[in-house]
């Protein structure tokens, strides 16, 4: 093992997601001390239809995770947000299964987001998603169940994942402003196929509240975890 090699972040990505990889690269250390490696699982549209929900079957994700293990990554991140509408226990089960099958530490974007909300003490949030009403309702209910009130919500009403990636930064920022019209403790941009990372600092200065972008929060947590993890052989 080369003790000087970069730490390797393995990411499980929805197959039609075209945002998270370029956004992740922007957030990694400029010195090259961490590299990102991606395995994909088929996800082409997001809705409350049963066929859409089945895209996030644990067994499918495990196949993709096992391929990442072949690259001897040091950490595996499920970089999707489906647990926000499937139920937060979905990602807890997935992370446990990945760790059990691969022996590699794992986390998820939703786990990172919820840990950040807890750290901030955020109990009222503004929610920005590209999703349809049925998914938004599930997300709001799931956050209510963990003591977080969605005080303002703005959605894009899209189901095709490739269309979600086309939402521009100006539109994302406008959605965040709308979600912050009522007093909130934080704004959550919930979707790893929304290019919200680059507008976070601008929005935080403008709105004077923390703004949590899914990709950014996930990468920040992973960098913290990688600092604790030894390099794999």
What is each of the regions a protein language model found here?
Residues 65-107:
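Glycine/small-residue-rich loop that forms an oxyanion/phosphate-binding "nest" at active or ligand-binding sites
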Residues 10, 74-79, 126-128, 184-191:
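Periplasmic-binding protein-like
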Residues 82-87, 160-166, 195:
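Short, small-residue-enriched loops and turns at beta-alpha junctions
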Residues 60-66, 168-182:
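A short, acidic, amphipathic alpha-helical segment used as a generic capping/interface helix at domain edges
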Residues 158-163, 211-231:
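Short, flexible loop segments at boundaries between secondary-structure elements
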Residues 1-63, 128-168:
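N-terminal glycine-rich anion-binding loop in soluble enzyme alpha/beta folds
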Residues 92-117, 203-222:
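Short, acidic/small-residue loops that bind anionic groups at enzyme active sites
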Residues 174-206, 219:
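Hydrophobic alpha-helical
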